[in-house]
Amino acid sequence: MGNLLKVLTCTDLEQGPNFFLDFENAQPTESEKEIYNQVNVVLKDAEGILEDLQSYRGAGHEIREAIQHPADEKLQEKAWGAVVPLVGKLKKFYEFSQRLEAALRGLLGALTSTPYSPTQHLEREQALAKQFAEILHFTLRFDELKMTNPAIQNDFSYYRRTLSRMRINNVPAEGENEVNNELANRMSLFYAEATPMLKTLSDATTKFVSENKNLPIENTTDCLSTMASVCRVMLETPEYRSRFTNEETVSFCLRVMVGVIILYDHVHPVGAFAKTSKIDMKGCIKVLKDQPPNSVEGLLNALRYTTKHLNDETTSKQIKSMLQ
């Protein structure tokens, strides 16, 4: 994702160390390898998940035909036959979210451990920092695609309604083994979210903090705010931005920046928008607004609708108006 990138990180928004964070070529050191390899097994499937989601067309036509002609058995069978394999895909996406959650928790454990500061972790463990960024990048790409595809929830709702009717009528349901009732309930909650992958990561980060009570919460929140600063500085500094060899690096940095802001806002007691926040929210929003509008609308919506503290009374009117 670009060549060697020099970034300025400020753990406490004062002068911080300069170091290179290589989003493209970072290789794991011996101490990183165990976690890196575990996370890599998950990440290598990420692109295929996105391709499947991008090509997801839904069974809207077949479902409409079946609903309009309830007595026509052939149309009912055709709709069911179209929906079952699609639900198999939706199940695969959901199961991948669970794997991604486990990968994130492994990375958080490595990047927040004592005795190093978040800045030292990101500098020393660049391969893990890169994987953390890749998880966030995937998450926002997934959610952008999901938000613009209403067929997903329509297909799954039809599947559940039809399955329920078949049970009442004691009709054997081919494909029922694909998704049992408990799994279907969890999938329904997942797909009901506007940004389901981001919600999964937010919940995982909150759970990580609550389960690691011996670890200061600042270790986690400072890791997130430092990563946000890294991305913002790379994007707003022409000298750094000119080093990008690929325009895709810009969208990579934007998605990672937004992802860590949302995670920070869910984990930090007062959130990302408070005056005491270690994230320069005005600077981050300005960077987003400086991009072509159609390329960042999904990211701005993620900040508007999936953060926790944006609408708090303590959030400045200026920040609220910037996101209107």
Swiss-Prot record:
Q: What GO CC terms are in its UniProt record?
A: cilium; extracellular exosome; extracellular region; membrane; mitochondrion; platelet alpha granule lumen
| UniProt key word Cytoplasm | no
Keyword Membrane among UniProt keywords: yes
- Give the induction annotation: Protein levels are negatively regulated by Salmonella.
What does the entry's PTM section describe?
Answer: Ubiquitinated at Lys-74 upon Salmonella bacterial infection.
Localization = Membrane; Mitochondrion
List the keywords (alphabetical): Isopeptide bond, Lipoprotein, Membrane, Mitochondrion, Myristate, Ubl conjugation
One GO biological process this protein is involved in is: negative regulation of small GTPase mediated signal transduction
Q: Say where the cross-link Glycyl lysine isopeptide (Lys-Gly) (interchain with G-Cter in ubiquitin) occurs.
A: K74
Q: Name one GO molecular function term.
A: small GTPase binding
Q: Where is the lipid attached (N-myristoyl glycine)?
A: G2
Membrane topology per the entry is: Lipid-anchor
Highest taxon above the source species: Eukaryota
Task of the protein: Negatively regulates RAC1 signaling and RAC1-driven cytoskeletal remodeling. Regulates chemotaxis, cell migration and epithelial polarization by controlling the polarity, plasticity, duration and extent of protrusions. Limits Rac1 mediated activation of the Scar/WAVE complex, focuses protrusion signals and regulates pseudopod complexity by inhibiting Scar/WAVE-induced actin polymerization. Protects against Salmonella bacterial infection. Attenuates processes such as macropinocytosis, phagocytosis and cell migration and restrict sopE-mediated bacterial entry.
Family recorded in the similarity comment: Belongs to the CYRI family.
What is its quaternary makeup? Answer: Interacts with RAC1 (GTP-bound form preferentially).
Protein name per Swiss-Prot or TrEMBL? CYFIP-related Rac1 interactor B
Per the UniProt record, the source organism is Homo sapiens
